[in-house]
Amino acid sequence: MGDAAVPAMVVEEEEQEHVFRSRFPPVAVPDGVTVPEFVLDGAEAYADRVALVEAAAGGRSYTYGEVARDTARFARALRSVGVRKGHVVVVALPNLAVYPVVSLGIMSAGAVFSGVNPRALAAEIKKQVEDSEAKLVVANEVAFDKVKDAGVPVIGVGDRERMPGAISWDGLLAAADRTGAGVVPVDAAQQSDLCALPYSSGTTGVSKGVMLSHRNLVSNLCSSMFAVAPETAGQVVTLGLMPFFHIYGITGICCATLRHKGTVVVMDRFDLRTFLRALVDHRVMFAPLVPPVMLAMVKSPVADEFDLSDLALKSVMTAAAPLAPDLLAAFQRKFPGVQVEEAYGLTEHSCITLTHAAGDGHGHVAKKSSVGFILPNLEVKFVDPDTGRSLPANTPGELCVRSQSVMQGYYKRKEETERTVDGKGWLHTGDVGYIDGDGDVFIVDRIKELIKYKGFQVAPAELEAVLLSHPSVEDAAVFGVPDEEAGEVPVACVVRRHGAEEGEEEIVAYVAERVASYKRVRVLHIVDAIPKSVSGKILRRQLRDEFIKRMKPSA
Amino acid sequence: MVSTNAGGIASKQASSMAPNPGKATILALGHAFPQQLVMQDYVVDGFMRNTNCDDPELKEKLTRLCKTTTVKTRYVVMSEEILKSYPELAQEGQPTMKQRLDISNKAVTQMATEASLACVRSWGGALSEITHLVYVSSSEARFPGGDLHLARALGLSPDVRRVMLAFTGCSGGVAGLRVAKGLAESCPGARVLLATSETTIVGFRPPSPDRPYDLVGVALFGDGAGAAVVGADPTPVERPLFELHSALQRFLPDTDKTIDGRLTEEGIKFQLGRELPHIIEANVEAFCQKLMQEHPQAADKLTYGDMFWAVHPGGPAILTKMEGRLGLDGGKLRASRSALRDFGNASSNTIVYVLENMVEETRQRREEAAEEEDCEWGLILAFGPGITFEGILARNLQARARARD
């Protein structure tokens, strides 16, 4: 082969690329606007309308006028105390009405919003504060004791008495109201600047800061809201139960709803009565949920205390956790008018990537078990993890996505970034899936969680779905553990439904009847609960580590 | 709308003191602050970090010194952007007077303009009605002076009669009121705009662990601007706040080194004598007595407890020593202590903030129909380099008229 042959080969390879795009036409992404400008665009016309309301009795609410005003006030306050472009502010708040005001204020100041679970351990929060080199922390009573010794000043939202040493939110805003313009102007935020640094869930590997720019989030919102009907502006009521420190909570729920001038009904912790009361009283139309909440809606006797015949609820959405078929069926029997949607997204892609939600009139509803279709402006391909070559439709491979929503990288982790986003801008998700002939995408599993049994790949999610179809199984998790002979064997943890009497062997046999022999569950444990991440993902790695630790002494 | 307004004014005036004809009154007050807010509780940590200093003893000392100022928040012109544009300001021994004045001149005019506009809005009159401008600043030096720059920025008439009081330091605000009072009383119909504006940029020094005492100075002083409209014989739509009855000035012989400021190539360098609070304590009562003699009726009827006290809060020690010497109860200097807490010692501006706090206290008492009565008569006091005492015997015209006989 001469030198001239090299380019020819490249061309040949490119010809073989199997890249899939949305069935819907591209949508325009406005240039030059920051996330707060995009989200609060047109807020003046809705100044007296409620933007955010806490579901709990006596909860705080914000009108659009107040959101716009206090976002600007907080941005000004941050600048007045020296926060500048690129500085990170960690937010350790539960879901509160003020939460989006805090995050939009941070972004508006040109700074970077980094949410953290306020109920995480003090050491975990401190790690994020240190890794992100945060200048400030915003907290309330829930997390104050955990953040007060993190080494940076804390802005306390809420009861001052219970947060001694914190900068009072109200006091700071009032003091900053008095400030004037700078003699040398402050650098304004640009669309290409970073605006968020969420830490990726940590279900795989070390928790890493995901660098997202204003452009990333604006383009993600444009794609995921492509089918939102303009005439419903100001009318949609969304439930804000998913945690706001998670990228889906702050962008998919808060930013999307505020952009469309709807109302977010804010709930901190799940409580069935408060939840149902919120659905009834606030006429919630769209509710992103996790499967256990749907289970409670269907099964709990508490639900009978409410008249649920006249709900405004149009759709619920689950993401990140598979829905058991019998739960889906039971839910649809009880709430026949409610559409159940699934979605797929990842922090590294600024949130939603694939969805069912096309709204009315777009003529496409993705199949039940798929995670949806490709959103406008996105390119998707599936690559063979071993050869790196892209695969045609109906062939499982690692899902890769390319768009303007792909993160700028992992904060201070060049190597991990290069492993995740390749030179051509493809984000390698680590999830195995395929696309069918209709353009619906199916996720098989996490690459890292695939069980390798004597060279065969076993997908934990597939076995979990089988287990969940057993009438006595309430919840299940499957993972692989090392085995001398097979390499790895599938192990299951199962939560039995109340009153169920089936033994471990009976359930193992039930699975064996329904799957290929290499996929059989080899060990099964009855447990009280399955550990999950805040977004509902099963913490398989944790289960596996615990299992191995328990097995060791006897081995 | 018009009738509602008129009704409001009528009812306000019914419950307020009537000003004496021909006497100057403060018709409105205003303020403005620069962009940067300094939270005092975090000064030490920031300082330790910036200087890469982790000496726990020094840190404790600084923490204690910062607390003793009682200042919680201050506003300053200095910002990251300024240090980026003028990195030499953070270096020792650089000739930077020109750069400092460039920043200061611009900043003081900007702040004075904002404070004046806020004041004129509160007054309700028009800028074209301003006949005189008194401008006070110890933070700038140029030809033409800041008075002209301010007049131009506000769009005042070219015929406005200007006066500038430069380098009068902390007593400059009360000196400005004294001059404005003179102008208002000597020119019938005059409406005098007083503006004060100060920044510590000229004296900014990079933090250094070798000079912990520097930080106390830095931790005490703040930047900002103040404004007042002064005029005699208020019209029915004007709402006079204080009557400026008599104004006096006095310097204390042989104390000129106690507050010492020198302009150098590296900026202004201040030294405050540790004996300052003691000198003030030793001399303040005689000065107050002299002011009280100016009371139209028998001055001996006035007691310290009967009066309001609008005192420039140079520092917490000065206030505490005054309270002790004059036997004032803790609430008497509340307006002064609040101003110190919220703005630090903002030099000539501070007296404007103290008076604004008093107006607010009076308003709140009225709103809550509190038992506690406002004092009609009181003293406006400030102390500056010289040592100079400035004082005005004044009346709070918003105080509710006491039921007499």
From Swiss-Prot, chain A:
Gene that produces this protein: 4CLL9
Organism whose genome encodes this protein: Oryza sativa subsp. japonica (Rice)
Enzyme class: ligase
Residues that hold CoA according to the record: 269, 454-455
Region (SBD2) residue spans: 343-410
Catalytic activity: (E)-4-coumarate + ATP + CoA = (E)-4-coumaroyl-CoA + AMP + diphosphate; (E)-4-coumarate + ATP + H(+) = (E)-4-coumaroyl-AMP + diphosphate; (E)-4-coumaroyl-AMP + CoA = (E)-4-coumaroyl-CoA + AMP + H(+)
Cofactor: Mg(2+)
Name this protein carries in UniProt: 4-coumarate--CoA ligase-like 9
Highest taxon of source: Eukaryota
Residues bound to (E)-4-coumaroyl-AMP: 248, 320, 343, 347, 448, 452
GO biological process: fatty-acyl-CoA biosynthetic process; phenylpropanoid metabolic process; sporopollenin biosynthetic process
Entries under InterPro entries matching the protein: AMP-bd_C, AMP-bd_C_sf, AMP-binding_CS, AMP-dep_synth/lig_dom, ANL_N_sf
Family according to the record: Belongs to the ATP-dependent AMP-binding enzyme family.
EC number: 6.2.1.12
Binding site for ATP: 200-204, 208, 342-343, 347, 431, 446, 537
TM stretches of this protein: none
Subunit: Interacts with STS1.
SUPFAM superfamilies: Acetyl-CoA synthetase-like
Entry's Gene Ontology cellular component terms: endoplasmic reticulum
Function: Carboxylate--CoA ligase that may use 4-coumarate as substrate. Follows a two-step reaction mechanism, wherein the carboxylate substrate first undergoes adenylation by ATP, followed by a thioesterification in the presence of CoA to yield the final CoA thioester.
One Pfam entry name: AMP-binding
Domain description: Both substrate-binding domains (SBD1 and SBD2) are involved in the substrate recognition, and are sufficient to confer the substrate specificity.
Keywords (A to Z) from UniProt: ATP-binding, Ligase, Magnesium, Nucleotide-binding
Curated annotation (Swiss-Prot), chain B:
CDD domains (alphabetical): CHS_like (cd00831)
Gene3D superfamilies with a match to the protein in the record: 3.40.47.10
Assembly description: Interacts with STS1.
Keywords, sorted A to Z: Acyltransferase, Endoplasmic reticulum, Transferase
Compartment(s) of residence: Endoplasmic reticulum
Protein name: Type III polyketide synthase 10
Family: Belongs to the thiolase-like superfamily. Chalcone/stilbene synthases family.
Recorded phenotype for the gene knockout or disruption: Defective pollen exine and Ubisch bodies patterning, shrunken and aborted pollen grains, and male sterility. Male sterility and defective pollen walls. Altered composition of lipidic and phenolic compounds in anthers. No significant reduction in sporopollenin accumulation.
Top-level EC class: transferase
Species whose genome carries this gene: Oryza sativa subsp. japonica (Rice)
Tissue-level expression: Expressed in adult flowers.
